A protein has these predicted regions:
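A short Gly-Trp-Pro
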Residues: 1-5, 10-129
Length: 129
């Protein structure tokens, strides 16, 4: 299990299992937010709590803490064809030692292809210095 919270602790998330990877995306939103995402489906091993404010650019809702402004998670606005709603939590809100060895998957989101690049051996600890 791994968990994280915003700076003030009002918004929290929990993953029942250690994520297999963290995603670093270079799209205009993720790059500016400086996030590392762990993906799953709402109610299926990932839970979130606390009041948030959201920004809804298209099909996703980016959720921030009302008090401190930390980006906590995003989720799809509507469930997919199988009735499941995709969600991603910001692993940068976890304690560093809890997520240090999770490998990074790099994604090209800037051109909207969301193509995965080959792994280069880096993990979260390499992104935090």
């Amino acid at each position: 299990m791994v968990q994280g919270s915003c700076h003030c602790g009002a918004v929290q998330w929990r993953c029942q299992a250690i994520p297999d990877s963290a995603e670093a995306c270079n799209c205009t939103i993720c790059r500016r937010y400086g996030v590392l995402w762990a993906y799953g489906f709402e109610g299926e091993g990932i839970s979130v709590s606390g009041a948030t404010q959201s920004y809804i650019p298209r099909r996703t809702e980016f959720h921030f803490c009302f008090a401190c402004g930390c980006v906590a998670y995003w989720r799809e606005r509507e469930p997919g064809p199988k009735g499941r709603r995709r969600i991603a939590v910001n692993l940068r809100l976890a304690e560093p030692e809890a997520v240090a060895q999770i490998p990074i998957d790099r994604v090209v989101g800037l051109d909207d292809t969301f193509k995965h690049l080959p792994r280069d051996g880096r993990c979260i600890t390499d992104y935090w210095f």
